């Protein structure tokens, strides 16, 4: 059991149950998965960028990332169907808890002028999406190997039914939201 998972079972779940008064312990919101995504529009001209994105995402996540490909051809973007356009990985169980712990404890405090995460990333069903502008905030990324600075989307999928439940779950886990 990871550190953050232990915090969830010992402190967060009882606090959520007390706040919202669930009838069953299975109703208590939890984190189901974390999805990481890098979209690279420049990859249509330079295919080597995709390899770097896959390697960086694999290093950050601890799980092999897959290449995402264009579903349709778009002439304005010089894009053909099947061309690589990004990279993604979905984390579950222990890797998910390890990544969330690393994000909250190490990566977010390394963001320049960090004042907290805006809570506008909730989707209405308790899931939270956060954009990261630079991957260099993660300790696994080696600065000398980076060709271009890339950003990433992090989606935290929860079993919460409302944004209020999802926000409280993440706050109790230590996610630094803006006050």
From Swiss-Prot:
GO terms for cellular component: ribonucleoprotein complex; ribosome. InterPro entries: Ribosomal_uL5, Ribosomal_uL5_bac-type, Ribosomal_uL5_C, Ribosomal_uL5_CS, Ribosomal_uL5_dom_sf, Ribosomal_uL5_N. GO terms for molecular function: rRNA binding; structural constituent of ribosome; tRNA binding. It comes from the Bacteria. The keyword Ribosomal protein applies. SUPFAM superfamilies: RL5-like. GO terms for biological process: translation. It holds the Pfam family Ribosomal_L5_C. Keywords: Ribonucleoprotein, Ribosomal protein, RNA-binding, rRNA-binding, tRNA-binding. Part of the 50S ribosomal subunit; part of the 5S rRNA/L5/L18/L25 subcomplex. Contacts the 5S rRNA and the P site tRNA. Forms a bridge to the 30S subunit in the 70S ribosome. PANTHER family: 60S RIBOSOMAL PROTEIN L11-RELATED. Belongs to the universal ribosomal protein uL5 family. HAMAP family: Ribosomal_uL5_B. This is one of the proteins that bind and probably mediate the attachment of the 5S RNA into the large ribosomal subunit, where it forms part of the central protuberance. In the 70S ribosome it contacts protein S13 of the 30S subunit (bridge B1b), connecting the 2 subunits; this bridge is implicated in subunit movement. Contacts the P site tRNA; the 5S rRNA and some of its associated proteins might help stabilize positioning of ribosome-bound tRNAs. This is Large ribosomal subunit protein uL5. It comes from Maridesulfovibrio salexigens (strain ATCC 14822 / DSM 2638 / NCIMB 8403 / VKM B-1763).
């Amino acid at each position: 059991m990871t550190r953050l998972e232990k915090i969830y079972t010992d402190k967060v779940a009882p606090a959520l149950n007390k706040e919202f008064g669930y009838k069953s312990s299975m109703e208590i919101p939890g984190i189901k998965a974390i999805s990481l995504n890098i979209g690279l529009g420049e990859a249509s001209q330079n295919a080597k960028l995709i390899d770097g994105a896959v390697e960086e995402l694999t290093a950050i996540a601890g799980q092999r990332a897959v290449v995402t490909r264009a579903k349709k051809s778009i002439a304005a973007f010089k894009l053909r169907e099947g061309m690589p356009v990004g990279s993604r990985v979905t984390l579950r169980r222990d890797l998910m808890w390890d990544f969330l712990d690393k994000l909250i404890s190490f990566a977010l405090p390394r963001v320049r002028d960090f004042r907290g995460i805006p809570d506008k990333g909730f989707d209405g069903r308790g899931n939270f999406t956060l954009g990261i502008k630079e991957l260099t905030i993660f300790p696994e990324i080696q600065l000398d190997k980076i060709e271009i600075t890339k950003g990433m989307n992090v989606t935290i999928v929860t079993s919460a039914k409302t944004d209020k439940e999802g926000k409280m779950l993440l706050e109790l886990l230590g996610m630094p939201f803006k006050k």
